[in-house]
């Protein structure tokens, strides 16, 4: 490492030495500050959460280059299209391409690939030249005027998922920031939303506060939080939904369900369900709430609430994702592939379909079994962040750290607090069932939408898809009886604070490793 940075002295890459030193200082300050806050009892956990997750996410956001996260370019395009609408400008050209500033064409048609005929996305391939390009471009001054287009097409989803990033892009355009400044400001707004909703989750949930904190410190979660990915929005909203339901279910019997609670759940249904349909399954957790909490004559009120929330879920999904619904229930199982054959014909791929699954009722279970046998270890690794970027094997979290992340998270999930409400056996069974059902729906949806009929395991499933409902499974094993283990105290820091501090330290080591990997790639 020392030899590498010595080679930068006196060259155009000398700025990387300062960046690396600044990165180390920032990480040390963040970790030291959070450990000090843990020792001060007057600081609430949700306040420490916001500071820790926002600051760590900010460092991840600035270190991992723009548009390097999984599918980030598609979500950036969606946010840019919404920004066009906010500014009252044409969203697309006559050919259906999203309009962007000429300045921002640099991001989607990066000249650093030295191929004028190839539209390479900045951050698609990570090497030293990406940092050099960002340094040369700067943050604050756009150098080009006029408009251009991007060939990238946005993801079809609710505009709510891109509202904050689009606000960041709009502000950057009004301030005439450079392309790099624009893309970072949009990322910043998405991170701000994630940290805010996460802090609200930790404050609201009656159990598992440290668990939500720990999952938010996974390298994968921090990378997504500081990117344009709508997974950041989904994870944050899912966490808050789980916290709201647990609060309503486990609060004291005298705390009934009010109109405000129903409105809150209805708003969450509108915000979350159309973004990624499968996560609407989380609303089944509402059945944890005792019917008696609806007050006198509860059943009519309960039924009305269920019908209202259910109608909002179904209606919002059909309004936003009608074509996707048809795609998942596709009877023919034939889809157009994006490439052409050598003869110029459009290639078609036969996918698994519902008729096939209905005819052979054990097929889906055999395929899921094969998938878990082949990719189960990868799911566990990529949930934490085994590979960052676009599954870049060089931007990796080492195996010992993956084990420690999982071990720390499991301990924080299982070891409860004496004063917190306990989950009953029916509660635990239902939470376990909802987790299995959501996992099953996830697998089946990817089987029907992406998996060729001649493939015996499911394609397209990634570990990050499990993050929004991972707390449901882990909280089902909560054991307040083990609260004595929290009495373990090291250097004046509590058990949970010690584990969270270790996770932050591992995040720092992972990020430093990623930076060194990228700068070594000439």
Walk through the language-model features, giving the residues of each.
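Membrane-interface alpha helices of multi-pass inner-membrane proteins
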Residues: 223, 260-277, 282-288
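Transmembrane-helix signature of polytopic, membrane-embedded enzymes
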Residues: 43-47, 177-180, 199-219
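Interfacial juxtamembrane loops and adjacent helix segments
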Residues: 86-185
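Transmembrane-helix motifs of polytopic, lipid-linked glycan transferases
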Residues: 32-36, 181-208
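Perimembrane helix-loop-helix junctions
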Residues: 244-257, 280-314, 328, 334-335
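Short acidic/glycine- and proline-prone juxtamembrane loop motifs at membrane-interface regions
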Residues: 227-234
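Membrane-lumen/periplasm interface segments of multi-pass, membrane-embedded glycan/lipid transferases
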Residues: 3-18, 322-418
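Membrane-interface helix-loop-helix junctions at transmembrane boundaries of multi-pass membrane enzymes
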Residues: 40-43, 294-303, 411-436
């Amino acid at each position: 490492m020392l030899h590498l940075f010595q080679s930068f002295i006196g060259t155009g890459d000398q700025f990387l030495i300062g960046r690396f030193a600044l990165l180390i200082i920032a990480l040390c300050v963040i970790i030291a500050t959070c450990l000090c806050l843990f020792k001060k009892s007057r600081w609430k956990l949700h306040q420490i959460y916001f500071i820790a997750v926002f600051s760590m996410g900010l460092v991840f956001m600035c270190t991992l280059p723009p548009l390097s996260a999984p599918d980030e370019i598609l979500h950036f395009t969606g946010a840019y299209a919404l920004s066009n609408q906010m500014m009252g400008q044409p969203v697309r050209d006559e050919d259906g391409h999203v309009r962007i500033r000429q300045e921002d064409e640099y991001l989607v048609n990066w000249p650093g690939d030295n191929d004028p005929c190839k539209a390479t996305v900045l951050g698609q391939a990570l090497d030293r030249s990406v940092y050099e390009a960002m340094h040369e471009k700067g943050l604050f001054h756009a150098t080009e005027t006029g408009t251009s287009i991007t060939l990238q097409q946005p993801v079809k989803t609710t505009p709510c998922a891109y509202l904050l990033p689009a606000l960041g892009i709009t502000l950057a355009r009004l301030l005439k920031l450079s392309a790099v400044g624009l893309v970072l400001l949009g990322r910043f707004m998405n991170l701000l939303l994630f940290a805010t909703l996460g802090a609200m989750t930790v404050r609201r949930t009656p159990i598992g506060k440290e668990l939500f904190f720990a999952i938010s410190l996974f390298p994968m979660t921090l990378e997504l939080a500081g990117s344009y990915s709508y997974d950041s929005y989904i994870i944050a909203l899912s966490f808050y939904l789980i916290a709201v339901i647990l609060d309503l279910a486990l609060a004291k019997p005298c705390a009934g369900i009010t109109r405000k609670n129903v409105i809150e759940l209805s708003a969450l249904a509108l915000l979350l369900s159309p973004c990624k349909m499968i996560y609407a399954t989380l609303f089944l957790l509402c059945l944890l709430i005792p019917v008696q909490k609806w007050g006198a004559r509860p059943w009519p009120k309960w039924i009305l609430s269920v019908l209202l929330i259910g109608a909002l879920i179904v209606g919002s999904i059909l309004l936003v994702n009608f074509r996707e619904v048809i795609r998942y229930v596709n009877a023919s199982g034939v889809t157009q592939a994006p490439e052409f054959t050598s003869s110029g014909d459009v290639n078609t791929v036969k996918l698994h379909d519902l008729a096939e699954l209905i005819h052979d009722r054990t097929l889906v279970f055999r395929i899921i079994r094969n998938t878990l046998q082949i990719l189960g270890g990868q799911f566990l690794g990529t949930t934490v962040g085994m590979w960052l970027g676009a599954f870049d094997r060089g931007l990796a979290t080492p195996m010992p750290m993956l084990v420690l992340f999982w071990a720390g998270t499991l301990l924080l999930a299982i070891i409860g607090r004496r004063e917190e409400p306990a989950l009953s056996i029916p509660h635990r069974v239902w939470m376990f069932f909802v987790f299995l059902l959501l996992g099953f729906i996830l697998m089946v949806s990817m089987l029907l939408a992406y998996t060729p009929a001649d493939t015996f395991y499911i394609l397209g499933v990634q570990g990050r898809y499990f993050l929004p409902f991972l707390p449901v499974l882990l909280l089902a094993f909560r054991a307040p009886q083990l609260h004595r283990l929290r009495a373990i105290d090291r250097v004046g820091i509590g058990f949970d604070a010690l584990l969270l501090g270790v996770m932050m330290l591992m995040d720092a080591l992972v990020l430093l490793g990623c930076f060194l990997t990228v700068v070594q790639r000439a």
